[in-house]
Amino acid sequence: MYPSVNRAHLDSVGPFAADRTVNLSKIAPKVAVATRPESHHRAGKMKALVLSGGAGTRLRPITHTSAKQLVPVANKPVLFYGLEAIAEAGITEVGIIVGDTAAEIRAAVGDGSRFGIEVTYIPQDEPLGLAHAVLIARRFLGDDDFVMYLGDNFIVGGIAGLVEEFRADRPDAQILLTRVPDPSAFGVAELDGDGRVAALEEKPKEPKSDLALVGVYLFTSVVHEAVRSIAPSWRGELEITHAIQWLIDQRRDVRSTTIRGYWKDTGNVTDMLEVNRTVLETVEPSVEGADVDDESEIIGRVRIEAGAKVSGSRIVGPAIIGARSVISGAYVGPFTSVSEDCRIEDSEIEYSIVLRGASIDGVRRVEASLIGHDVEVTPAPRSPSAHRLVLGDHSKVQISS
C-alpha cells in the first residue's frame, strides 16, 4: 500500500512547453499534416520502453544491495511513479530493460497488473548505452511508436499530454528539455532560430546551451535505422543523442518540448531528498489504522500508515510513517519519509529518507540523510570521545565534532 498523493497539486507545480509554454495535461489534439514522409503511417498503438539497468554509482553504498530505481520517495519506489505516468498516458505494453538487479525489479513490479500495464522484461548484459537498449528491444517494439522513459527520472504532471501531442503530430522524434545550471553533466540540445533541434551533444565540456535532455524520448520506428547506423562513443556506448543527431542529419522531423515545471534525475542523494520533499508536499494526511497516543503531537500534512505506533513523539509534516514502524520519544521533522518496519526512539530526524527495517536509537539529530535497509544508528559511548563506524565502499559521512 503506497501513499496517496494530491495529483491536482502536483500538476499545478508547473506547466510544460512545446517550443512555447503549454500545459501538457491540457494539450488539444492537433491535425497531422498530410504531407508527411513515408514513415508517417497512421498512428497505431504506442508502447513504452523503461530503462532500469544502470549501476547507480552515485547512490552507493545504497545501490550495492538495491536497484537505484527502487529507492523510495514518499515511501514509493521512484520507478513506480514512472510506470504510473505511462499507464495514465494510455500505454499498456511496457518493456523494462533490466541489468544486474533484474531479480529485484521483477519482484517489485511483477507482471505490471497492479499498474494496469503488461510488462515484458528485456535483459541487458552490460550498460552499453540508451541506443543499445533500443537496439536489443527491437523484437518487443516492432514497428510501433514508443516512449523511452528512464526509470530513475521524476517528472511532475506525468507525460499524458506529451504523448497526446506526439500521437497527433507524429514527428520522427520528440525530446524533452529543461534548463539546468550545469549542462555539462547532461546531454545538451542546441536549437536554431526557429526553435527546432539543430544539434545534440552528450555531456559536453563546453555546452552550447543550457538545455539538458530530460529522460523521456518519443520515437516512431525510424529510430531503429538510426541506432543501427551509429558507432559507439568514446565511452564505449551507443548514445541516444548520436541516434537523434543522425535523424537530424538525415533531415528527419525532430522536435523538442521544454519543461517549465519540475524534473529531477534521482541519481544522487541530494536530488533524491529534493524529490522526496516535493512529493511529500502532496501526500494526503491520515492516521487511520495507526496507534497514536495522547502524548504525541501530529502537526501538518502527516500520513501514518496502518499498524504504525507513535508514542510520546512530535511529528511535523509533511512527513510519512510506514506501516508497522514504531516512533517513541522522538521528533520527526518536515520532509521525512520513514518506511515500513522501522524504529525511531529518543532521536530527532528531519529532511531524510529511512528505508525498510532501519532503526535510530538515542541519536541527537539526523538531517539530510538517506538511511539504508536494516541499518542501525546508535550513539557512541561518551568516553572515550570517538566515532565508531562501519562504512561500505564509496560511503560519504559528515561527523559533528
Predicted regions and their residues:
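Conserved N-terminal catalytic core of the sugar/cofactor nucleotidyltransferase
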Residues: 2, 27, 32-50, 58-61, ...
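Active-site glycine-centered loops adjacent to acidic/histidine catalytic or metal-binding residues
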Residues: 54, 152, 179, 268
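A structural signal for short hydrophobic beta-strand segments in well-ordered beta-sheet cores
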Residues: 70, 189-191, 256
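Short, conserved catalytic or adaptor-binding loops enriched in Gly and charged residues
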Residues: 111-116, 191, 247-248
